[in-house]
């Protein structure tokens, strides 16, 4: 798994167990963000839910998702969160000097999740990290102490999570062709379902509080009204590229969306300034596949199998960012955790769905029974008086 994200001029890349960073204005080689040896065992929050008592042992740590905080805190802190195949969520903070150089980075907290994480995002205030997992559950973790609560559950694997800019809606995309908008933090209230995709929904991009873009396996780009939740307002068919859509990223400053596809090197940039969506295709020089894409200021940052490119939205020119040999090897050799998200339609999917649903409800009932037992076992009545 390999990812790229950005905050202002700073870009972060995660691949395998590596985390690298660079500033766009410097155009220098990437630097190591933090060493895993800095993980403080005392800051690993023990899980409150019923999973393995010990942390999952893996042959090699692999990062499965990556996110950067939304705003600067009052002390100028920036936060980065990653989820790994150890079923852990690690939160780091870093500080910069007046020149924008990172002067220190340290481990804040680690939380343990029930299942392997698939998507991660900070809430509006950066007080919590929200994580979706393979089992269809969404948990929220405090960045201060790692405490966790379950926010939502589904039958299908969560593939992406996002927030509306006002922080009042949590948006979830899943493998069962749908997107949900949940009220936040009262996520027991589902405001709306967005139905129209015919294959899995892999990726979301939020334009404003009432404009959501989604895409995935059906090769279509959909635009939805979050408030009205009706049919898509705009649709763009990208099936001519003959590949599922891997990721979309929106640049609000230039009002453009970038689209990358599975296993091809083309980036499609969609101009949102006109009602009729206009597209421009950009082939990434010297690359065979685009793994991830992020937006920052005047650029789309594209992560490939062996390269990092910046697409300047003022002139559509590309800038090449040098990367080190270790990262190149990792980008080349690291594969997706799940290679194929399409459903197997060669057998009775209904039977499989009913089994997953029954298992999910059984887990919920177990949690309720355990909670009732805890309450009944702590009724405030101690042992009777002693006769001695």
Swiss-Prot record:
Pfam families: WD40. GO terms for cellular component: cytosol; nucleus; tRNA methyltransferase complex. It comes from the Eukaryota. SUPFAM superfamilies: Tricorn protease domain 2. Gene3D superfamilies: YVTN repeat-like/Quinoprotein amine dehydrogenase (2.130.10.10). One of its GO terms (biological process) is tRNA (guanine-N7)-methylation. Pathway: tRNA modification; N(7)-methylguanine-tRNA biosynthesis. Its main location: nucleus. WD repeats lie at residues 58-102, 112-151, 153-194, 196-234. Coiled coil: none annotated. The keyword tRNA processing applies. It is found in: Nucleus. Residues 365-388 are annotated as: Disordered. Keywords: Nucleus, Repeat, tRNA processing, WD repeat. Forms a heterodimer with the catalytic subunit. PANTHER family: TRNA (GUANINE-N(7)-)-METHYLTRANSFERASE NON-CATALYTIC SUBUNIT WDR4, WD40 REPEAT PROTEIN 4. Belongs to the WD repeat TRM82 family. Required for the formation of N(7)-methylguanine at position 46 (m7G46) in tRNA. In the complex, it is required to stabilize and induce conformational changes of the catalytic subunit. This is tRNA (guanine-N(7)-)-methyltransferase non-catalytic subunit. It comes from Caenorhabditis elegans. The gene is wdr-4.
């Amino acid at each position: 798994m390999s990812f790229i994200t950005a905050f202002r001029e700073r870009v972060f890349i995660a691949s395998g167990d590596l985390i690298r960073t660079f500033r766009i204005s410097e155009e220098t080689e990437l630097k190591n963000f933090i060493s895993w040896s800095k993980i403080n065992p005392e800051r690993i929050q023990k899980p409150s839910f019923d999973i393995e008592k010990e942390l999952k042992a893996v042959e090699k740590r692999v990062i499965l998702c990556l996110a950067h905080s939304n705003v600067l805190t009052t002390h100028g802190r920036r936060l980065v969160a990653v989820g790994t195949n150890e079923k852990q969520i690690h939160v780091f903070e870093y500080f910069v000097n007046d020149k924008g150089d990172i002067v220190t980075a340290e481990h804040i907290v680690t939380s343990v999740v029930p299942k392997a994480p698939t998507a991660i995002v900070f809430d509006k205030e950066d007080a919590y990290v929200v994580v979706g997992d393979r089992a269809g559950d969404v948990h929220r973790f405090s960045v201060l102490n790692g405490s966790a609560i379950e926010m939502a559950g589904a039958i299908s694997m969560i593939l992406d999570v996002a927030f509306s800019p006002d922080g009042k809606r949590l948006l979830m995309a899943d493998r069962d062709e749908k997107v949900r908008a949940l009220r936040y933090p009262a996520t027991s209230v589902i405001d709306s379902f967005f139905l129209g995709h015919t294959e899995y929904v892999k990726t979301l991009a939020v334009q404003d509080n009432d404009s959501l873009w989604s895409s995935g396996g059906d090769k279509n780009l959909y635009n939805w009204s979050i408030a009205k939740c009706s049919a898509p307002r705009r649709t763009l068919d990208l099936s001519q590229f003959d590949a599922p859509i891997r990721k979309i990223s929106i640049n609000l400053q230039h009002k453009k969306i970038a689209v990358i596809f599975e296993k091809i090197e083309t980036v499609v940039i969609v101009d949102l300034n006109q009602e009729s969506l206009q597209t421009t295709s950009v082939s990434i020089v010297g690359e065979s596949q685009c793994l991830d894409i992020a937006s920052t200021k005047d650029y789309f940052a594209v992560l490939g199998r062996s390269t990092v490119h910046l697409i300047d939205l003022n002139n559509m020119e590309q800038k090449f960012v040098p990367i080190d040999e270790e990262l190149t090897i990792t980008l080349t050799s690291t594969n997706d955790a799940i290679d194929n998200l399409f459903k197997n339609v060669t057998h009775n999917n209904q039977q499989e769905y009913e089994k997953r649903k029954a298992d999910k409800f059984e887990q919920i009932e177990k949690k309720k029974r355990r909670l009732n037992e805890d309450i009944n076992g702590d009724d405030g009545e101690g042992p009777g008086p002693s006769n001695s």
